[in-house]
C-alpha cells in the first residue's frame, strides 16, 4: 500500500501545469538519491549554502545566486534586499520599526501584472505602487512613479502577466537612470533554459525562478540570480541568519536536491521535450475534433507564456457542460485527471506534466465525458464531497 493510499489521498494525473496546489513537479531522476545522501550527515549550513549558490551561479551564467524556499520567498528576500541593501543599520531599523521606516520602501508594478503572488512584496513590508492599466502603460507613468522612496520595480515577463506593460528594456533604462533596481519574477519562465541568464544579461538586477516546476527539484526551493551586492543582501535576511526570511528555511536536503536537479535540467534536450508535447497535443486535437460538439485548437505560447503548447478543448452549448463541470468530471472517478479552466465551456490540456503513457487515459476520459449525457453540476459536486 502506497503512502497516499494509507492517507486516503488520491493520486492525480496532471494535465494542467506545474502548479503548487498539485505538488509542482515530479523529481528529476537523480534528485531523490542526492537528497537521501545529504540527509545522512550534519553540515555547516552557511558553508553549504555558499557552495551550492556558487555552483548555481556558475551553471546559470550569473554574477551570483542564492537558493531560497520557493519563488515567492525569493520575491520576499529580493524586496528586503532592495530596501535595506547590506546596511546593517537599516536592517536593524527594519526589524524594530518595519519597512515603512526605511527610506526606500515602495515597489512599482504594472497594473496588468498584478496577481495573487505579489502579496510577497507586502509580506516584506513594502508598499506596492501600481502604474498603467490593463491595456497600456505610458513611459511617463513609470517615470512619475519613481521617487526617493522607490526600492525596486517588479517586472513580470510573458503575455499572461505582462499585459499593458512597458518593454523590459525600457523599464531597465528608466529605473537604472534613477538608481532603482529591477526584479524579474520569472518563476514559471522555464523553458527555455536560456531564461536563467537572459533577464540578467539584459540588465535585470535580480531574477527569481521556481526550483520545483520545470527544473523538477524540491517544490520548496527557488533560485535568485543577479547582482552580487543584492544577492549578498538577500542572504543577510535569510536562514540560517536570524532575519525576517528565517521562516523561509531551505534544508540541506533541498539545497543539494535543487542543485542536482538544475544540473540535470541543463543537460536535457529541451527541444525533444517540446516536440513530445507538440506531438501529444496534436494527437489530442485530431481525435477530439472528430467528436460531435467538440472543438480543439492549439494554444501557444502555453501556460504563463511559456514555449510549450497546450490544447484548448471547447464543448458546444448543446453538450450542456460549463468549463467547471468538464473539469470536475475529469477529476471524478478513476483516474482523477486535473485540467485548467479556459473559457466559458472550455478547458486546457497540457502534455508537459504527464508521465509517459498518461496522454492515453486523458484523451479516453475526455472522449467519454463528451459522449455521455450531461449529468448536471449538482451530481458532479456531490460526488466530490
Protein language model annotation of sequence segments:
Residues 1-27, 50-68, 72-266, 278, ...:
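Conserved PLP-enzyme active-site core in the AAT-like
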Residues 3, 287-364, 368:
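Conserved C-terminal alpha-helix-loop-beta "cap" of PLP-dependent enzymes
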Residues 11-21, 30-39, 308-313:
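Generic N-terminal amphipathic, Lys/Arg-enriched alpha-helix
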Residues 36-48, 223-224:
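An acidic intrinsically disordered interaction segment
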Residues 45-50, 64-65, 245-249, 268-277, ...:
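Flexible, glycine/charged-enriched surface loops at secondary-structure junctions
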